[in-house]
Every structure is written in structure tokens, then in C-alpha cells.
Regions:
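Nucleotide-activated chemistry modules centered on ATP-dependent adenylation/adenylyltransferase
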Residues: 1-216
Length: 216
């Protein structure tokens, strides 16, 4: 989608009085969409899934982007304290059961918001993984929410060019070889063959679970 097409689609949602929110991981690849939205929708809620395991650099970058773009940030956190997120052997779930860890810290905390809103905007791109390649620009999500993926057909090159054009900052870990940045325990440096392979390294896992329900 072009920027104009994104704007037109969001205007349709607004005319229909649909309640809209966006989720963002606040990586460099997130900033193009956030910049576009900040120029279209005033006071849109930007949900950040604050797991408590993020790199300090991610939190700093998030705060910088929020201030730069004038975003309304909502920290979404698990009801289960981090210290209690351990299995019967005392291991953190990110070690013994990463799927359950993602459920506790991402999927479950977001569910109440899915029931309150009509449209969920996400910056997933088809070139990020095989799972995301199967997604559509607009499709039905859980709790009858509309999933809108305006950046789905954008490439990493387009994101970069947009960022350069608008002089937008990059995540400080990019220069250190981290291109897909999530929680500290589950993030490794970039593998050119698969952008998402830097996440959950060695676990045969490239998605946290927020988007897998869209793939049939």
C-alpha cells in the first residue's frame, strides 16, 4: 500500500466510527508505520507489549520515538509478575516453554484490548517470515476485530528509504547486528537468510503467537 492508500483506508475506518489502535515493538522497522499514522490519526493508542525482558536500548528508543512523533503510549503488561513466570523446576518459561512465555506476556495481556476496539493495526511485513507471507492486508482477527496490515507489501529497502527521506532515527542495536529485536533472552544477531530467525534462536519458532491465529 502507498501512504495515500493507507490514509484512505484509515479515513474509511474513522468515517465508520471504528475504534482503532496499533501495536508496535519499537524497532527501526516500526518507525515508518508510526510516522505515517501520527500524521493521520490524532491520539491513536500505541500498545507496547512490555514483557519486562526488553533490551534497555529498546525502552530508550521507544521513549525517543514517542516524544518525536507525539504518540499516545500504552504499556501492556502481564498480570503474572516476572519472578513468578517459572516452571516446576524453577526455570523461567522463556527457557522451558517459550510459547507459554509469549502467551503470558503478549497474547493474554492484549486480549482485553481486542474486545474493546474494532481495528488493530500492525506493521507486519510479508518478507519477514513464511507465516507473515500468508497474511492479508485486511483480515478478520480474534474477537471479531479487523486486522489491518498497511506495511505488508513493503520491503526492508522501502522502510529504509522512507526513514532516510523523513530523517527518522534507528534502534541503537541495529549497528550491532540485531535486526529483529525482541526480548533479551530470545534475541540473537541477524541471519541474512531469515529476518525472524534472530528470534527464539534454536527453538524452531519465529512468531510470538499474536499473528499465528491468522494463518489457516
Amino acid at each position: 500500500m502507498t501512504v495515500v492508500e493507507i490514509k484512505n483506508q484509515i479515513e474509511k475506518y474513522k468515517i465508520s466510527k471504528k475504534k482503532i489502535f496499533v501495536t508496535s515493538s519499537f524497532q527501526t522497522q516500526s518507525i515508518a508505520m508510526l510516522h505515517i499514522l501520527s500524521n493521520i490519526v490524532e491520539d491513536i493508542n500505541v500498545m507496547f507489549l512490555h514483557t519486562g525482558f526488553h533490551f534497555p536500548e529498546t525502552i530508550s528508543f521507544r521513549d525517543k520515538v514517542v516524544e518525536l512523533l507525539g504518540l499516545h503510549l500504552v504499556d501492556v503488561k502481564s498480570l503474572v509478575p516476572k519472578i513468578q513466570q517459572k516452571d516446576g523446576n524453577g526455570q523461567f518459561y522463556f527457557v522451558s516453554d517459550p510459547d507459554y512465555c509469549c502467551f503470558l506476556n503478549k497474547t493474554q495481556p492484549l486480549e482485553p484490548y481486542l474486545m474493546q476496539y474494532d481495528v488493530w493495526i500492525s506493521g507486519v511485513r510479508a518478507d519477514q517470515s513464511a507465516t507473515r507471507k500468508k497474511m492479508k492486508v485486511e483480515q478478520q482477527g480474534p474477537f471479531d476485530i479487523i486486522r489491518f496490515h498497511p506495511m505488508l507489501d513493503w520491503s526492508a529497502k522501502q522502510i529504509y528509504e522512507y526513514r532516510m527521506l523523513h530523517q527518522l532515527p534507528e534502534h541503537p542495536l541495529d549497528k550491532k547486528g540485531y535486526q529483529s529485536i525482541g526480548c533479551v533472552p530470545c534475541t540473537r544477531k541477524f541471519d541474512m537468510s531469515n529476518e525472524r530467525s534472530a528470534r527464539w534462536f534454536g527453538m524452531n519458532k519465529t512468531e510470538c503467537g499474536l499473528h499465528t491465529d491468522l494463518i489457516k
